[in-house]
Curated annotation (Swiss-Prot):
Alphabetical list of Pfam families matching this protein: BioG
Protein name: Uncharacterized protein HI_1552
Organism: Haemophilus influenzae (strain ATCC 51907 / DSM 11121 / KW20 / Rd)
InterPro entries documented for this protein: BioG (IPR007398)
Top-rank taxon: Bacteria
């Protein structure tokens, strides 16, 4: 995987695991708490995180979409101050708890520049949000195609769940990728669930990182 590190000589760290195909800049507007660094993880063609976490006193995790499944594997055994899931589950390719298998497989098999744009329109919901999302520097098409190919294969082989303890989950009421019903079904007995008005890409509704775990 790739990482983008924002080093403010902080004592604490926020670890953000992005969704598949999404630009790291999609969370750039969120204001960091005092004394925190930020590490953004993305491009999951492999699950190797080459970063020393041991220097930090507290680590908070925020994982979006496919990042929930990835974070569970990467952060097993790491002590977390909190773990927040946003519009994702630990079973991302699943008819009852994630994206239905046929839709996931179809997205991969039919992926083109054009269908990618349609997907991004679906995660944003309306035209204005989509146009704002398009201002983020887009990741190369070949890269996101390889990423989804790798993720699909890894997810079929590894269906373990509950590898880390999640403190809370956000569920967008109009999510067209991970349906709210499937998300609620997955998280109901696992952690506190907060439903929010919005689409799959919901970070535009927040101004501060801390609002994702303090509510």
């Amino acid at each position: 995987m790739k990482t983008k590190f924002y080093d403010y000589q902080g004592e604490h760290l926020i670890l953000y695991f992005a969704g598949w195909g999404t630009p790291p800049d999609a969370v750039n507007h969120l204001i960091l708490p005092e004394n925190h660094d930020l590490l953004i993880c993305y491009d999951y063609q492999d699950l190797n995180l080459d970063f020393d976490l041991s220097a930090y006193r507290h680590i908070r995790l925020v994982a979006w979409s496919m990042g929930v499944w990835v974070a569970e594997r990467v952060l097993q055994g790491i002590r977390l101050k909190s773990a927040t899931a946003v519009n994702g589950t630990g079973l991302p390719c699943d008819d009852s708890f994630g994206i239905p298998y046929a839709i996931f497989k179809g997205t991969l098999e039919n992926l083109t520049e054009n269908t990618r744009l349609k997907f991004e329109r679906r995660i944003c919901g309306d035209k204005a949000s989509f146009e704002r999302y398009q201002l983020f520097p887009a990741r190369p098409f070949d890269e996101i195609h390889q990423e989804l190919t790798a993720l699909f294969a890894m997810i079929q082989q590894d269906k373990r769940i509950d590898l880390i303890h999640w403190a809370n989950a956000w569920v967008s009421s109009r999510d067209k990728i991970f349906t709210p019903a499937n998300q609620h079904q997955y998280w109901a007995l696992r952690c506190a669930v907060q439903e929010i008005e919005g689409e799959h890409y919901v970070f535009s509704r927040f101004t501060h990182w801390s609002a994702l775990w303090d509510h």
